[in-house]
């Protein structure tokens, strides 16, 4: 399959913002894609060489190396590339322009660098893989030579997208939801098989692999997909509510209630002595927790199992729960053995999704929990999450306050009904989180995605100091703006913010962003931040829940304040408009109750 085809479609995709048009173009590309390399086509669209869970290195090519490779490929001095970059602001565009110059074309032809055969997807992928895997002494030269060789053979348009891919700025604005719609339409003629594709992807979070199965075996083959050790399952997510009586009613009157620990959610896979640990974002974090790997080998009584829990920092002396920030300190340590001693951890397990080749995701929670309890040998490092079963609101609240006093964030209230399956990759009311109140503030924080930024005034003049934040809408695969956040940042965080944002600056709005506001700069949706505020309120400026409450108005966070970056969350894990709408309704109900009490 020619890489030229992908480059041409990337060029078309970049020029449109309608999701329907994006899906139609992508459908067309998948129809033309070689069945043997469609997995690689999907990875390239996602802006990666392989799924994150493999833990392989990223390309590791900085701007200076890219400039050098381009200069070698087109036979000009590095200064020429740098000058063009100042004018254009996009190395991909620079590479394309320089490839079009008569000097570049004639010299390369004379050198025999341009053959009659164009680049193939396989050849391009192989070269990019070589660049990513190069390490140690001489790796810098290998990366430069490999990339320069690839760019020499590439057409101007191919060079543009190869450079953008390597630079981490592909900018085609396509999310996984759009890819799944396009796969369904390309291979079945409609989106009716999208739920089956999504179910398979949720159980085996490798969209390239799913695409290859569809292309080679047909979409019906996905019905046989089940969890597999080594490939993470997309995590089940909880809804949020603040009224304990309503929560119990929502889950059917009876619930399993777990502590909600302030740690790192981890999905742990074991097959014989092989252990893998994946983060909430499905990244391979095994090397960060060699102590947990040993605990699993020693205390989990199963040959093949996938379990889920929270890795929590504990005090080395008292074994009491420590804040999440201590895990972050541990991750920053270069000496992992020293980190283990200084920041020990316990693991609090709460679910089981695979046991000895049997898929447990479709079994009710009580059955999953029973099996989880059976596979853990008695020990003081791996624990079942502290929990109760209850149908009583008072007992729920007593347990909630017990959780808070013991260092937890709150509790997770979980349905124990017959339909209490593990909803991989979905957010629903089978699990509901109840977290502590923030006094006069919102009942809960929200996790929002940075989509743009504004320059400050006064002492913050010339600095990007206000962020345009958005919620993720899974139904439309778009980001709806919620608020502008300017408070809560320390001076050090503000300084770090400048670099962070300029690295992901875009020339125009990302196609997935739905905004009425025009920030000073647009950025690629990449970072998730936890935000707290006074309340959820109506706003004519923002697009989140637009027209749902009042015509012409959306919902916004009043007096928003930055709490922390949520590096453990992907942008698709951000708070949804539906959740924000529910929080707004909670506020209205609370005010009505207070008014009723005052009148009484």
Curated annotation (Swiss-Prot):
Superkingdom classification of source: Archaea
Chain residues that bind ATP: 258, 265, 280, 310, 350, 427, 433
Cystines in this chain: none
Cofactor: Mg(2+)
Gene Ontology annotations of biological process type: cell division; DNA biosynthetic process; DNA recombination; DNA repair; lagging strand elongation
Reaction it catalyzes: ATP + (deoxyribonucleotide)n-3'-hydroxyl + 5'-phospho-(deoxyribonucleotide)m = (deoxyribonucleotide)n+m + AMP + diphosphate
Activity control: Inhibited by PCNA123 and PCNA323.
Active site (UniProt): 260 (n6-amp-lysine intermediate)
InterPro entries registered for this protein in UniProt: ATP-dep_DNA_ligase, DNA_ligae_ATP-dep_bac/arc, DNA_ligase_ATP-dep, DNA_ligase_ATP-dep_C, DNA_ligase_ATP-dep_cent, DNA_ligase_ATP-dep_CS, DNA_ligase_ATP-dep_N, DNA_ligase_N_sf
Keywords: ATP-binding, Cell cycle, Cell division, DNA damage, DNA recombination, DNA repair, DNA replication, Ligase, Magnesium, Metal-binding, Nucleotide-binding
EC number(s) per entry: 6.5.1.1
A Pfam family recorded for this sequence: DNA_ligase_A_M
Enzyme class: ligase
GO molecular-function terms, A-Z: ATP binding; DNA binding; DNA ligase (ATP) activity; metal ion binding
Job of this protein: DNA ligase that seals nicks in double-stranded DNA during DNA replication, DNA recombination and DNA repair.
Protein family according to the UniProt entry: Belongs to the ATP-dependent DNA ligase family.
Name of the protein described by the UniProt record: DNA ligase
Species assigned in the record: Sulfurisphaera tokodaii (strain DSM 16993 / JCM 10545 / NBRC 100140 / 7) (Sulfolobus tokodaii)
Organism taxonomic ancestry: Archaea, Thermoproteota, Thermoprotei, Sulfolobales, Sulfolobaceae
């Amino acid at each position: 399959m020619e890489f030229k085809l992908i480059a041409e479609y990337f060029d078309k995709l970049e020029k449109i913002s309608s999701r329907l048009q994006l899906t139609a173009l992508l459908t067309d590309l998948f129809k033309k894609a070689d069945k043997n390399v469609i997995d690689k086509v999907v990875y390239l669209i996602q802006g990666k060489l392989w799924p994150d869970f493999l833990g392989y290195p990223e390309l590791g090519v900085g701007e200076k190396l890219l400039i050098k490779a381009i200069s070698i490929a087109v036979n000009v001095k590095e200064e020429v590339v740098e000058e063009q970059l100042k004018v254009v602001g996009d190395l991909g565009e620079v590479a394309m322009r320089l490839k079009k110059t008569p000097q570049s074309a004639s010299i390369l032809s004379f050198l025999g660098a341009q053959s009659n055969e164009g680049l193939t997807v396989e050849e391009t992928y192989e070269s990019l893989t070589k660049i990513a895997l190069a390490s140690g002494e001489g790796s810098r030269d290998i990366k430069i030579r490999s990339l320069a060789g690839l760019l020499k053979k590439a057409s101007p348009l191919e060079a543009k997208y190869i450079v953008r891919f390597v630079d981490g700025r592909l900018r085609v604005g396509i999310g996984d939801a759009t890819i799944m719609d396009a796969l369904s339409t390309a291979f079945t003629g409609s989106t009716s098989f999208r739920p089956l594709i999504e179910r398979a992807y949720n159980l085996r979070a490798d969209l390239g692999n799913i695409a290859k199965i569809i292309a080679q075996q047909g979409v019906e083959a996905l019905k046989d997909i089940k969890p597999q050790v080594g490939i993470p399952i997309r995590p089940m997510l909880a809804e949020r509510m603040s009224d304990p009586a309503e929560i119990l009613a929502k889950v059917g009157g009876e619930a399993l209630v777990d502590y909600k620990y302030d740690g790192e959610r981890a999905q742990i896979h074991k097959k014989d002595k092989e252990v893998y640990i994946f983060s909430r974002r499905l990244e391979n974090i095994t090397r960060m927790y060699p102590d947990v790997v040993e605990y699993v080998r020693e205390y989990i009584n199963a040959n093949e199992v996938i379990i889920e829990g929270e890795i929590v920092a504990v005090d080395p002396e008292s074994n009491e729960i420590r804040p999440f920030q201590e895990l972050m300190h541990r991750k920053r340590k270069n000496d992992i053995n020293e980190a283990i001693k200084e920041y020990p951890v316990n693991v609090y397990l709460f679910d089981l999704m695979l046991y000895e080749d049997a898929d447990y995701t479709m079994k009710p929670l009580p059955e999953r929990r029973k099996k989880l309890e059976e596979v853990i040998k008695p020990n003081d490092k791996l624990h079942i999450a502290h929990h109760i079963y209850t149908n009583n609101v008072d007992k729920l609240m007593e347990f909630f306050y017990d959780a808070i006093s013991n260092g937890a964030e709150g509790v997770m209230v979980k349905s124990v009904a017959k339909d209490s399956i593990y909803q991989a990759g979905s957010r629903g009311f089978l699990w509901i989180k109840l977290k502590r109140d923030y006094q006069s503030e919102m009942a809960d924080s929200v996790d929002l995605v940075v989509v743009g930024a504004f320059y400050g005034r006064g002492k913050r003049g010339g600095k990007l100091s206000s962020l345009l934040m958005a919620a993720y809408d899974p139904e439309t695969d778009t980001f709806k703006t919620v608020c502008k956040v300017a408070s809560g940042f320390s001076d050090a965080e503000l300084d770090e913010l400048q670099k962070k944002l300029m690295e992901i600056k875009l020339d125009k709005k990302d196609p997935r962003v739905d905004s009425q506001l025009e920030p000073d700069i647009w950025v690629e949706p990449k970072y998730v931040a936890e935000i707290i505020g006074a309340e959820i309120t109506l706003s004519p400026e923002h697009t989140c829940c637009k027209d749902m409450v009042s015509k012409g108005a959306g919902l916004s966070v009043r007096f928003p304040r930055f709490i922390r970056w949520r590096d453990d969350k992907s942008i698709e894990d951000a708070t949804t408009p539906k959740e924000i709408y529910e929080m707004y309704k909670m506020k209205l109900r609370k005010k009505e109750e207070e008014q009723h009490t005052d009148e009484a």
